[in-house]
Amino acid sequence: MALSKSMHARNRYKDKPPDFAYLASKYPDFKQHIQINLNGRVSLNFKDPEAVRALTCTLLREDFGLSIDIPLERLIPTVPLRLNYIHWVEDLIGHQDSDKTTLRRGIDIGTGASCIYPLLGATLNGWYFLATEVDDMCFNYAKKNVEQNNLSDLIKVVKVPQKTLLMDALKEESEIVYDFCMCNPPFFANQLEAKGVNSRNSRRPPPSSVNTGGITEIMAEGGELEFVKRIIHDSLQLKKRLRWYSCMLGKKCSLAPLKEELRIQGVPKVTFTEFCQGRTMRWALAWSFYDDVTVPSPPSKRRKLEKPRKPITFVVLESVMKELSLKASSLGSETAEGIVVVTTWIEKILTDLKVQHKRIPCGREEVSLFLTAIENSWIHLRRKRRERVRQLREVPRAPEDVILALEERKSTPKELSSGQDVAHSPQESALCGLDVPGGEAAADGGHCLSQKLLCQEETPEATEDERDEERGGMEAMESCKGSSNGAQDGEASEKGDRLDGAAGRYLFKCLVNIKKEAGDAVVEMHWVEGQNRDLMNQLCTYVRNQILRLVAS
């Protein structure tokens, strides 16, 4: 997953990544490393050390006017990631809010062959750097890169003995107070860690770029954890010789123990951040012994990114809206048309269901409702209707001769006086659904007429809508706790819903938008929060079918 959107806000590559096609057209040295696929897309092989080096050198030349040489046998830095660190140091020392003419002094521990941090800091901000290096090859290349960019007056590269960090490097400059130190420590403790044998989760994809670092650049005794602890130990002795101490970390698991170490040592000011570039994530830790420094806030905890979910929608056709308007007029309501009448009926349905709702401000030609469902009242009604239909289906059908006899009786009605008692035959009583003495004998002689058929003749649209409603909410019904898998489950669900309501909790909250599109009304349900998104799906299906029933009735 690309993390470029999480780069530092001032990073020039955050919203405008390098244009490989443009760079290739301008720099022949870079052009020979690009690849063009059948769709014309330009890419770079980040597992090729020469290609990675060409990209770094080209970006420094194009965007910062810097010309450098880097040996393939040493670490090749990526420019966007290093730029993140520079911008964070700006935040630490308050560079953006201070007088830009004030000289800022920094230390780069282990500057590397590229000397990239001092070169960027001096070029962008005019900072003075003391850059230390233990490796002979890196030291020689770093001095050469500083000299060929005419920055020797701002960058001093010094060769130091192995395991030298801050104490020995500052012996000769005991009177100078530095504003900050930077460090990109060796990440690994041994070859196995460097190769990812015992340090990389098997579920993670392999690294997308090549590692060209030398032994002293990528490995140290105890790995980055012990390396940074040594810097902490030096800082406890130097204290206010530096306003800010900082280090970049390659492993997130190193962050917590280092923060704990600083807490144990009583360091008053501590902060951290994250550096993001492409698929690469790095962490940085900073601490200070000064009381007057401004501590940048650490990054807020980000929830795992979720794909934006589309709202649940249904369309109310223009013809249906006209019928709803006529229906409202026939019931004595004020005449309303368009999305207003749709909203009015939806609000009535929600009120009947005891779903809390209120209108909220929105744009023109649109109505918005904020819903809070306290209990699953719609599924209770659905369950009752399904149970009623099931009971009707279990009533046996009467024989055809009985039906014919009933029709003949209807065609030749008898005149009866108002005070005369009416005697029903067992068959006729069964057709009308009456309790008849000797009903068992009648049942033995034949079957009763299905009351479901009579129900269908009275309201033919109800059964069709019921089937449609069941189809629309079937998946939600199966996955929801409120679904009916029998009388016992239904009873438990109802009790649970009542408990939720009694305790002041809610099932879910959603936003309903009713807007006009091409003469029709589109109803959208947007999930906000709650127990189960399927519950919103059930409610949407119920509301839609209730609107269709209103038109059909």
Swiss-Prot record:
Catalytic activity line of the entry: adenosine in U6 snRNA + S-adenosyl-L-methionine = N(6)-methyladenosine in U6 snRNA + S-adenosyl-L-homocysteine + H(+); an adenosine in mRNA + S-adenosyl-L-methionine = an N(6)-methyladenosine in mRNA + S-adenosyl-L-homocysteine + H(+)
GO terms under cellular component: cytoplasm; nucleus
Gene Ontology biological process: mRNA catabolic process; mRNA destabilization; mRNA processing; negative regulation of 3'-UTR-mediated mRNA stabilization; post-transcriptional regulation of gene expression; regulation of mRNA splicing, via spliceosome; RNA methylation; S-adenosylmethionine biosynthetic process
Superkingdom assignment: Eukaryota
UniProt-listed Pfam families: Methyltransf_10
Stretch list, region Disordered: 457-496
Main location: nucleus
Modified residues (Phosphoserine): 329, 425, 429
EC number: 2.1.1.348, 2.1.1.346
Biased composition (Acidic residues): 458-468
Alphabetized UniProt keyword annotations: Cytoplasm, Methyltransferase, Nucleus, Phosphoprotein, RNA-binding, S-adenosyl-L-methionine, Transferase
Modulation of this protein's activity: Methyltransferase activity is autoinhibited by the K-loop region that blocks S-adenosyl-L-methionine-binding. Upon activation, K-loop changes conformation, allowing S-adenosyl-L-methionine-binding and subsequent methyltransferase activity. mRNA N6-adenosine-methyltransferase activity is inhibited by zinc.
Compartment(s): Nucleus; Cytoplasm
Start and end residues of each stretch annotated as RNA-binding: 17-20, 199-211, 250-254, 277-283
CDD domains given in the database record: AdoMet_MTases
Disulfide bonds: none
Region (VCR 2): 506-553
Residue span of region VCR 1: 289-400
Disruption phenotype: Embryonic lethality: embryos develop until blastocyst stage but development is stopped around the time of implantation. Defects are caused by dysregulation of MAT2A mRNAs.
GO molecular function, a single term: U6 snRNA 3'-end binding
Modified residue annotations for Phosphothreonine: 463
Protein role: RNA N6-methyltransferase that methylates adenosine residues at the N(6) position of a subset of RNAs and is involved in S-adenosyl-L-methionine homeostasis by regulating expression of MAT2A transcripts. Able to N6-methylate a subset of mRNAs and U6 small nuclear RNAs (U6 snRNAs). In contrast to the METTL3-METTL14 heterodimer, only able to methylate a limited number of RNAs: requires both a 5'UACAGAGAA-3' nonamer sequence and a specific RNA structure.
Domain notes: The VCR (vertebrate conserved) regions bind the first hairpin of MAT2A mRNAs. The VCR regions interact with the internal stem-loop within U6 snRNAs, inducing the conformational rearrangement of the A43-containing region of U6 snRNA, thereby modifying the RNA structure to become suitable for productive catalysis by the methyltransferase region. The K-loop region occludes the S-adenosyl-L-methionine-binding pocket. Upon activation, conformation of the K-loop changes, allowing S-adenosyl-L-methionine-binding.
Subunit structure: Interacts with MEPCE. Interacts with LARP7.
Family affiliation: Belongs to the methyltransferase superfamily. METTL16/RlmF family.
Stated name of the protein: RNA N(6)-adenosine-methyltransferase METTL16
